[in-house]
């Protein structure tokens, strides 16, 4: 259950960052509202996961999910570059998060 909470927390963190980007684009208050909800829910789920997972593992996986997710959202929806080097390093982050899960 803690891994489900952690994965959901990472996805919500990515959603919060995406809402921050949306707010910078069109300054609507709804983006701030969604940003706050996304980050609050993310921190809550992260804290639940950290009840049983080691802090270092939980935090590394949480930030990894947010980093990879944010980069992929940027590539897929905001026209950010998708060159081979960028994809390689995104894959390294993802592989590291999976590795931490396997040893925890």
UniProtKB/Swiss-Prot annotation:
InterPro entries the UniProt entry points to: Small_drug/metabolite_transptr (IPR000390), Small_multidrug_res (IPR045324)
Localization: Cell membrane
Protein name (database record): Probable guanidinium efflux system subunit GdnD
GO cellular component: plasma membrane
UniProt subunit comment: The efflux pump is composed of GdnC and GdnD.
Annotated function: Probably involved in guanidinium transport.
Predominant cellular place of this UniProt entry's protein: membrane
PANTHER family the record matches: GUANIDINIUM EXPORTER, SMR FAMILY PROTON-DEPENDENT DRUG EFFLUX TRANSPORTER SUGE
Gene label: gdnD
Homology family: Belongs to the drug/metabolite transporter (DMT) superfamily. Small multidrug resistance (SMR) (TC 2.A.7.1) family. YkkC/YkkD subfamily.
Keywords, alphabetical: Cell membrane, Ion transport, Membrane, Transmembrane, Transmembrane helix, Transport
Molecular function terms, GO-annotated: transmembrane transporter activity
Lineage top rank: taxon: Bacteria
BP GO terms, sorted: monoatomic ion transport
